[in-house]
């Protein structure tokens, strides 16, 4: 099977990108194992680190049957910005031109967002009779209405309306819709005004718990393995409720054994650093590579998921959620919705916006070893049952192979 993958912002298996692979990277690895021909269209701009990996269009051959086509476009500093819009439009248009020169694939698997990339995939699929599967990762453009202030939302409304029109068309014309949760799949079907078919399915974000290399560096001295560590890692941006983290930390200060470790960098790092400078039990550790994160998580007791209680996180299941439970870490969640239900149904954490309630829970599991161990086991069981990357992406590639076979049969008739 010849397949094109479209994903512009995830880590890739290339020499100058040392982060662990996410969803598209793991799908590509499973396809590679089965000797399928893969072209992954991505972006020369590293979305996580906000830096250019290459200064021109570049093809990286991972293996003989697996290539990554990095399309060059200008970078951006903020996730919601005009520069990012331009980046998305440029790589989408360049993809359209590049695609015309290549042998057509059997399938296209395109992440959503970006809207522009997905739109060009749909156009190509229609012109060339290639099935396009759209994989919903985030609820664009609806999230813009919620994340922008009222004046900015009003100014941006013409652009948002255009993007909403494009999104409806993408969801309507896709051969199939995938997503990372059932709720997000329903959102996509509603956008496309379509009935659910057997090909419209959701696959959770899988986390690969194998190959957990650990690097102990001098910096790791800041992690006290004997403390009751709550850990959180992310790009430090406006998706998270830092005020609540600080509020929770102050409530926990009375217990000197509890430490909140925050790993990451981003546009709001300097502001956060200033806010927590006098909070004794919060440690800002900066950006960490995957080996260092492994060390931190293996020496943590709880995983902190301080998402703002917005509709998109209420419908989603995050990378962080899967990673925390893979380590057997009960999760402290700030948002309601889909992840909240998973925690409640499986008794492996708490979801609340009430910091007093969160504080009581943390102190309770810290002081009740039996309760903590039961929750930790429940977290690992939930991971093994629903979030093991090898199982999820094996099933997903089985699904793609089945689509290819069935489409071939239709074309023969």
Predicted regions and their residues:
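Acceptor-binding helix/loop patch of EC 2.4 sugar-transfer enzymes
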Residues: 8, 14, 73-85, 103, ...
